[in-house]
Amino acid sequence: MKTLSSKIWMPTDLREAWRLRQLLQLESHFIAGGTLWQTKWEKGAPQPSHLISLENIKILEAIYEKEDGGQNFLHLGALIRLADCLRHPIIKAKWPLLTKAVKTIAAPAVRNLGTIGGNVASTIGDAIPALLVMEAKIGCFDGDDIKKIDLDHWLNEEFKDDLITEIVVPEISAPPSYVHFYQKIGRREAFSGSVVTIAGIIGQNDNGTIDFARLAAGGGENRPRRLRITEQLLAGRKVESALLKKVHEVVFSEFQPVGDAFFSADYRRRVAANIVIAELKKLEEKD
């Protein structure tokens, strides 16, 4: 492990952290658990001159559920440890897909340090596919106010200066017949990447017609993305062999990961398509 050479700043509120970031600019980075930056440093990335630690900003440690507009939401402060996401009874009971995703992240020692905010801030975190299909929002402090941004939009835009304050996840009230899945393919010891991470929620009505479909895929150094074309293909259709064949083709086409020295892009796409087909077959069995 490399020796830390950066100067550490310890602000106690959001405005102070923001002011430091504006003052130090590109020579600085926000840091919480540190596992994200440790990953980058182990791969040879240079250490910044200044690190702005967020660990003394208590507002970022909040975790609660709140109703808004008739819907229930989970509010996760950016400093909530990944391990706490696994242990918290509310999350386990009402947001099990998030629990399942977090359980796959690295080793227990890393989860004890790593934060949910850091996992999202990485833009390639394993929790992101699950958060995408639950249509989570990100709370970001812009120096004046905390704004809410759809996670999907946040990933597709550049918000490099944003200070993530919380992740807000709506509760999905779905019938037991719906298929909820999260799969991570590939070994992940310490800081090595996965082949594919994919999540989905798919449901059908009493007539066997698909009336709910959300899919998201990522893996390795690839930013997770919603598979909206595939979702549209599924809407209003019944699970049958012709549809399964078409879905495999569309997932393979829509999912556009980058390959590396270990796994080609086509291999990742094929794995993602195979997983979606397997989950659709489970839905067919419930019909």
Residue ranges and their predicted role:
Residues 1-287:
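C-terminal structural segment of proteins
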